[in-house]
Every structure is written in structure tokens, then in C-alpha cells.
């Protein structure tokens, strides 16, 4: 249960910090703010995990996992969770604020659980259900005080729902990928964040015409520092969530 509480609280913190970053220049006046902040968030998460796994002497485990069927499944899951889920999430924060975004997107574990039961025939233990409920409650409690709408409610809700669907489907694929010993929760998370970060920087950002915006964000210490802080909270949240 402690992992569920930690994951929920840290994810709410991640959301609030990103909302603050999006209110600062250059994000506040940039049409590509959602895309760029999502790309930088996942890229920083990948760098944090690279250092984390290197310090634990586990990079070789990740390298081996990449070449397995389970590792490739995690890569596919990363595309759903990163470019689709994370972009929708940041769009929602930009349009309807951190509070409403967190409250809506917090239901992605519930969707993932429902899909896992339906598709993978998994059975939920009572303590897992309680941990899930506690995580959802922690996110809502952390984010409730920052509920506000600053843009399009329609686009904001659609973005949040894209996050729920992307992350929920990602969770099912990850659960399947981690069924054997080839991929554990830490290697899966590193593969996930590295795949997502590289996909953003190599494909999504250039194709979205956001290279200039990304450069401006990287040279803005205040905004970039907040994105990095949010990424640190997000990485810790992911680690707790994968262990829950």
C-alpha cells in the first residue's frame, strides 16, 4: 500500500510542477508548449533512470532485456504511454489546469486494471484493489486545490482522456511483458522512458515543427528546471507504481 500512496502523491506533485512550468516563458506563449514539455519531461526521466541503473550496475540487464520479446513489448507500450499518453496529459494541463487533469488522468490505473482482468485474465487481490484506490485518492487530494480552467475545456478533457487510454493500454502491455523473468519493473521502466524520450526527440519534435521551441526551452533555466524537477517526481512515481 505504501507504494500506491507514494506513487499517487508524487504523480500529483509532478502534475502541479508541470502546470507551473507551462505558465512560464517560453511555454506560456508557445503553441508547441504541450509537445515540447512532454518531450523534455520523458527525456529527463530517461536520463535520471540511466544514472539510477548505472549506479546499481544494472545497465547490462536492460541491454539484455531489450533483445527479448518482452522487452520489445515494453517498447510498443512506451509509444502508447509517451507520445500519446504524455502529450495528451500535457495538452490537458495547458487547457484545463493541473487539478482537473490529475483528477481525470488518475483513472488510468483503473482502466489498466480492468483491461488486465479482461484481457490477461488476471485476478486482483484485495490489497491490490485497496492500494489502487489509495493511489487514486492521493492524486486527487494532492491536485484538488489547483483546479482551474484556462483554455478549451473540450480539448483539455480530450487530452486527459487520451492520457487515460494511452497509459491504461500501456499498463496492460507492460503487465504482459513483465510476466517472465526477462524484464523486471526497473528494466521495464528504463526501456519505457528511453524509448519514449528518443521517439519524442528524434521523430515527434522534428515532425511537429517544434525544434526551435525545444531549443528555447532548453536555454530557459527557470522553465527547464521545473520540468526537470517534475521529471524527478514522475520517475519516482513510476518506480513506486511499477512496484505496487
Feature names for model-found ranges:
Residues 19-31, 60-63, 94, 143-153, ...:
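Membrane-interface helix termini and inter-helical loops of multi-pass transporters
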Residues 29-82, 134, 166-170, 190-210, ...:
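Transmembrane alpha-helices of multi-pass small-molecule transport proteins
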Residues 1-8, 59-88, 155-163, 214-236:
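Loop-to-transmembrane-helix transition segments
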Residues 1-39, 150-179, 202:
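Glycine-/small-residue-enriched transmembrane alpha-helix faces in small-molecule transporters
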Residues 12, 16, 43, 79-83, ...:
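Hydrophobic/small/kink-forming positions within alpha-helical transmembrane segments
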Residues 21, 37, 92, 118-124, ...:
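Hydrophobic/aromatic residues within transmembrane alpha-helices
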Residues 115, 127-146:
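Hydrophobic transmembrane alpha-helices of multi-pass small-molecule transport proteins
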Residues 36-39, 43, 80, 89-123, ...:
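Specific alpha-helical transmembrane segments that line the substrate/conduction pathway
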Amino acid at each position: 500500500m505504501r507504494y500506491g500512496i507514494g506513487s499517487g502523491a508524487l504523480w500529483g506533485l509532478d502534475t502541479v510542477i508541470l502546470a507551473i512550468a507551462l505558465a512560464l516563458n517560453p511555454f506560456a506563449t508557445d503553441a508547441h508548449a504541450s509537445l515540447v514539455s512532454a518531450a523534455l519531461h520523458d527525456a529527463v526521466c530517461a536520463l535520471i533512470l540511466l544514472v539510477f541503473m548505472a549506479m546499481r550496475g544494472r545497465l547490462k540487464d536492460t541491454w539484455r532485456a531489450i533483445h527479448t520479446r518482452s522487452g520489445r513489448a515494453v517498447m510498443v507500450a512506451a509509444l502508447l504511454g509517451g507520445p500519446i499518453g504524455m502529450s495528451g496529459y500535457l495538452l490537458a494541463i495547458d487547457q484545463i489546469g493541473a487539478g482537473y487533469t490529475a483528477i481525470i488522468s488518475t483513472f488510468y490505473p483503473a482502466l489498466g486494471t480492468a483491461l488486465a482482468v479482461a484481457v490477461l485474465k488476471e485476478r486482483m487481490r484485495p490489497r491490490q484493489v485497496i492500494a489502487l484506490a489509495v493511489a487514486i485518492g492521493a492524486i486527487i487530494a494532492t491536485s484538488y486545490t489547483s483546479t482551474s480552467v484556462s483554455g478549451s475545456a473540450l480539448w483539455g478533457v480530450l487530452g486527459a482522456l487520451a492520457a487515460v487510454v494511452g497509459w491504461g493500454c500501456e499498463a496492460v502491455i507492460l503487465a504482459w511483458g513483465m510476466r517472465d523473468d526477462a524484464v523486471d519493473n526497473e528494466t521495464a521502466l528504463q526501456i519505457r522512458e528511453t524509448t519514449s524520450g528518443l521517439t519524442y526527440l528524434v521523430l515527434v519534435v522534428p515532425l511537429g515543427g517544434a525544434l526551435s521551441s525545444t531549443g528555447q526551452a532548453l536555454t530557459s533555466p527557470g522553465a527547464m528546471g521545473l520540468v526537470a524537477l517534475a521529471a524527478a517526481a514522475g520517475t519516482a512515481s513510476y518506480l513506486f507504481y511499477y512496484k505496487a
